[in-house]
């Protein structure tokens, strides 16, 4: 899940990315911030539930229980998503190796909770 300026439009990207022998593959769903603000004008000032359901067949990304992207992992060469992984929560600032604008700092990245379920 990423926040990007896509042209002049602030957007949320729900991405899956994998590599096969150096060939990078993406499944991206781009939703403008206006899409969410049209549902709730105060949307960007609230906490939201981001969810990843990862089964033997699919990976699905949800925002506030709305499905925003999914892939069938059985269709991916090498079964990259059938290995063990770890969770990484970070605030990546900058883009393509560029230094972030110091005038935008400091920033706050608040996470209320993390839940992990495993079958």
Model-derived regions, located:
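GH16 jelly-roll
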Residues: 1-119
């Amino acid at each position: 899940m990423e926040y990007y300026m896509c042209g002049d439009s602030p957007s949320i990207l729900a991405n899956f990315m994998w590599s096969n022998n150096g060939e990078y593959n993406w499944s991206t769903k781009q939703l403008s911030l206006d899409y969410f603000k049209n549902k709730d004008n105060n949307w960007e000032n609230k906490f939201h539930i981001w969810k990843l359901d990862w089964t033997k067949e699919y990976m699905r990304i949800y925002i506030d229980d709305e499905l925003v992207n999914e892939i069938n992992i059985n269709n991916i060469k090498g079964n990259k998503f059938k290995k063990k992984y770890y969770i990484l929560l970070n605030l990546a600032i900058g883009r393509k190796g560029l230094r972030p604008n110091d005038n935008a700092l400091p920033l706050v990245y608040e996470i209320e909770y993390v839940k992990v379920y495993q079958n």
